[in-house]
Regions:
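Short alpha-helical transmembrane segments in multi-pass integral membrane proteins
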Residues: 1-34, 88-155, 186, 197-269, ...
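Transmembrane helical elements of multi-pass membrane transporters/channels
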Residues: 29-48, 149, 160, 227-231, ...
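Helix-terminus/linker motif at the lipid-water interface of multi-pass membrane proteins
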Residues: 39-61, 130-137, 193-197, 207-215, ...
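Small-residue-rich hydrophobic transmembrane alpha-helices
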Residues: 60-120, 157-176, 286, 299-357, ...
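Small-residue-enriched core segments of transmembrane alpha-helices in multipass membrane transport
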Residues: 180-187, 305-308, 418-427
Length: 472
């Protein structure tokens, strides 16, 4: 019988020696739903890309131009709310349930303030952003509308991400995956009606008129926004109604505490800076790619979506590692934190190695899901096969960084990611793009990911990431 995370935490606090088989089972029990959740999230991205891609390469390029900016803005917010889930994991590991509920309440206030502020900022710059990024004049109107709608939904996007992260910190990885599954299904339905115009379809041999808004690119953003809003409200509802260590119906204060602010600064600031550094580098990469033509822009955007099929497993295991290492550190069990870190990292490397093989074999078919443009498919398949060789080391960096974040060592992750992304990838892409085009940009990415994975494995082996100690 698999231990629950709550039972494991109790045994760790008592100083018991938990068998490796038990730790492996609980790591799998938390990882599998998280991997499935990442699969659903990636499927939602595939749906958007495929439905828009079949409109034409211009529509795909319109989204691709602003995609790196969505990563930048969302990434900063993810860094901040991940800091809240790390605090909760460590407090639950130390059996400080009242403190964990206090952090949850404070996170809800931060979510409201930051979400509304980010939405206002994104909508405000949406009119000018495509031009800043060098988009062709023919793409700017649809790119601007897409980014404005996406930005307006940020409070709900943050709510879904933050509250599902809280649930995972308690050891409940199943509920977030079910919420994500529903969100994906709703996204399909909304996109079906919002992207396409009113049209005739064959249903059981009969021609049926189906209403459609015909919004094209903005319709994809609106469908995702509506489905994510429902997901965020559902996650909040679970936290409001369910009994358990994070039940906020139990008495407690909504006051923002100095301890929470200190921990948010210590963990959240480097995480947000890391996300900003990675995403702003992606913005510069898109700026480099935007000068290579519409086919290269579309192939790059769809290639990134296709590659998501590979690294979703890594991010699913990363979610589990944050919860596991966070609770082990909270229970003051360095030995268990190390065990979980290496166990999860090896799982990530192994699964992403298999994913890389699949990516190399099925690259043309994956690109064909998103577009019928032969030139885009050919170029996209070529760069995906380059990227396939980096997947195992990319998995190492993803999961090892999650382990370090769970221990509160977000500064170390920031430094390694900053060096590899800005010192290696951008430099190589700048040098190779004029000579090799999009192939050069993705070759730079492959080299950088291998270097990044090696750096994270070295830091994991040295063990200094555990020196931060438990949060106050």
């Amino acid at each position: 019988m698999t231990l629950s995370l709550e039972q494991l935490s109790a045994r760790m606090r008592q100083g018991e020696d938990v068998p490796l088989s038990d730790t492996a089972r609980i790591a799998l029990a938390l990882s599998i739903p998280s991997i499935l959740e990442q699969l659903v999230v990636t499927a939602m991205e595939y749906i958007d890309a495929a439905m828009v891609g079949h409109i034409g390469a211009e529509a795909t390029a319109a989204i691709g131009i602003v995609s790196s900016s969505t990563w930048l803005l969302h990434g900063i917010l993810v860094g901040l709310y991940t800091a809240f889930s790390i605090q909760i994991a460590q407090y639950l590991g130390a059996d400080r349930q009242q403190d964990a509920r206090g952090v949850l309440r404070q996170s809800m206030l931060f979510n409201l303030i930051l979400g509304l502020g980010a939405a206002a900022f994104g909508v405000g710059i949406s009119r000018f952003l495509p031009g800043w990024l060098g988009a062709d004049i023919s793409l700017q109107a649809s790119s601007s509308a897409y980014f404005a709608i996406w930005s307006a939904a940020l409070p709900f996007t943050m709510a879904m991400g933050m509250y599902t992260a809280m649930l995972r910190a308690t050891g409940d990885a199943l509920t977030p995956s079910l919420i994500s599954l529903l969100v994906c299904a709703l996204d399909v339905v909304f996109n079906f009606f919002l992207i396409n115009p009113t049209r005739q379809i064959l249903l059981f041999g009969q021609s049926v008129t189906v209403w459609g808004a015909g919004l094209e690119v903005p319709g994809a953003a609106l469908g995702t926004a509506l489905s994510t809003a429902i997901g965020g409200l559902l996650a909040l509802g679970v936290l409001l109604l369910r009994d358990g260590p994070l039940c906020i119906r139990k008495p407690g204060s909504w006051r923002i505490t100095s301890a929470c602010l200190r921990n948010l600064w210590r963990v959240g600031t480097p995480l947000a800076a890391e996300r900003a550094a990675l995403s702003s580098a992606q913005v510069l990469l898109v700026r480099i790619v935007s000068g290579l033509g519409t086919v290269a822009i579309a192939a790059n955007s769809l290639g990134v979506s296709a590659e998501g099929l590979c690294y979703m497993a890594g991010y699913g295991i990363q979610d589990a590692s944050i919860a596991l290492i966070g609770q082990a550190v909270g229970a003051h069990r360095r030995d268990m934190a190390k065990r979980f870190a290496w166990l999860c990292t090896m799982m990530g490397i192994g699964i992403m190695a298999l994913s890389g093989v699949g990516l190399w074999l099925f690259a043309p078919a994956l690109m064909g899901i998103f577009t019928a443009d032969a030139a885009v498919i050919a170029l996209g398949a070529q760069v995906l096969r380059i990227e396939a060789f980096a997947e195992p080391m990319f998995g190492a960096s993803i999961v090892a960084s999650g382990a370090m974040q769970g221990a509160g060592d977000s500064t170390g992750c920031f430094v390694l990611n900053l060096f590899s992304m800005w010192g290696v990838r951008l430099t190589l892409a700048f040098l190779l793009a004029p000579r090799l085009g999009l192939v050069g940009v993705w070759a730079a990415m492959c080299i950088e990911l291998c270097i990044r994975g090696a750096l994270f494995l070295i830091r994991l082996a040295r063990g200094k990431w555990l020196d931060k100690g438990a949060l106050q």
